Amino acid sequence: MATVPEKIHVLIPCAGSGSRAGTALPKQYTLLQGQPLVIHTVKAFAQVAGLSQCLLVVAPGDVTLSDFLTQYGLGHWSVASVGGATRAQSVLAGLRHLHSQGASDADWVMVHDAARCLIEPAHIANLISACRADAV
């Protein structure tokens, strides 16, 4: 049986520029059914019980996400403007930010890309259950 962490955090990198997608806006802000992709992603995680801190990592100067979070009633999510040039750099900066906000080395952090909006709350809950039931 895995050691159950005191806290499970969520880190969603959202600092992409959309250059590979060839879009005017970053891909995470592309609309799907009238809402930005990132909002679909955040809503899925928002429905999962037992998550501690939920952090979205954006590029420095990006205020678009905070506006969207407020607009869709998700203003309680934390946003850190520490995104890097690559996804890996953004994740590392996000992990450092979580640590500076009290996350411990023993806590778990779930990382999920902002533009991967087809995740469902049941998928997330099942992953947590599977990890808790197996030595990781």
Which residues make up each language-model segment?
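N-terminal glycine-rich phosphate-binding loop and ensuing alpha1 helix
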Residues: 4-63
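Short, glycine/charged-enriched secondary-structure capping and boundary segments
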Residues: 25-28, 69-72, 95-96, 123-127
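Short helix-capping segments at alpha-helix termini
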Residues: 48-50, 71-77, 102-103
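Short active-site oxyanion
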Residues: 51-55, 78, 135
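Acidic helix N-cap motif at the loop->helix transition within catalytic regions
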Residues: 63-69
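Conserved donor nucleotide-binding strand/loop of the catalytic core
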Residues: 73-87
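Conserved beta-loop-beta/alpha segment of the NTase-like Rossmann-fold superfamily
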Residues: 85-136
